[in-house]
Amino acid sequence: MIKLVNIKMEYDKKVVLDNINLTVASGETVAIIGPSGSGKSTLLRLMVGLTKPSAGEIWIENEEISQYKENALNKVRLKMGMVFQYSALFDFLSVGENVAFGLRQHTKLSNKEIQAIVKEKLRVVGLVGKEDFMPNQLSGGMKKRVSLARAIAINPQIILYDEPTAGLDPIMSAKIDKTIMNTQKIIGGVSVVVTHNMASAFAIADRIIMIYEGKIIAEGSTAAIKESDNDIVQKFIGDYKNIKQLVHENEVLEIED
């Protein structure tokens, strides 16, 4: 479980997040949407302890972490997996070693045990047999999936995704969405996805939260968000519908897998 209570975040006297209250239960996938600069990625940074709030509480399971020091935070982070916007793979390590990195850093497992886990996590994300590939041999979508395999290697209770479909074409984005959904079925736990991609949000989320100018202005199921009478929400969804129509009119002819 993740729970944020009365969170306020200020930078240089500018309020970035204002009175944020949200809970994500175990087994739930929540998508956080909103325009650029609305505070979405700041929320992720708060959840993982990279930023401290100006006020409020951050609960990870039964621990309130908002004032934790780095050593205590590192223990909490072992419960989390993070999938970054640009994959953040180590270019000098193979796919297998990228996935194994956290296991080597934070466990005392044997090399044989680590290799077995690496193979299993690559199977989960649909990259069987890619252990010896280098990152520069992979497409953008494959890099995202390696990043996800690395994130779930330590069997986290929480997975945080920062723009997992950024820079991908619609069909590759749909493949990433499917991977996220399959991973959630296998791992369970909590998934929080920050995204601009409304098609992804509607596909993967049990619940959607929209942030605008640092405040939660809408929250609910995908159906509730689609039917919201909030003008800002409808404008955001309307932009998505226009893009979706454009994609249908101009089909993607070449896909890199």
Positions of the model-derived regions?
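Catalytic Walker B motif of ABC-type/P-loop ATPase nucleotide-binding domains
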Residues: I159-D162
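A short, proline-enriched helix->beta-strand linker immediately N-terminal to the Walker B motif
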Residues: A153-Q157
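Helix-to-loop junction immediately C-terminal to a conserved catalytic motif
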Residues: V48
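Conserved ABC ATPase "signature" region
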Residues: E64, N111-G129
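The feature captures the beta-strand-to-loop junction immediately N-terminal to the Walker
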Residues: I33-P35
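Conserved ABC ATPase signature
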Residues: M134-L138, M142
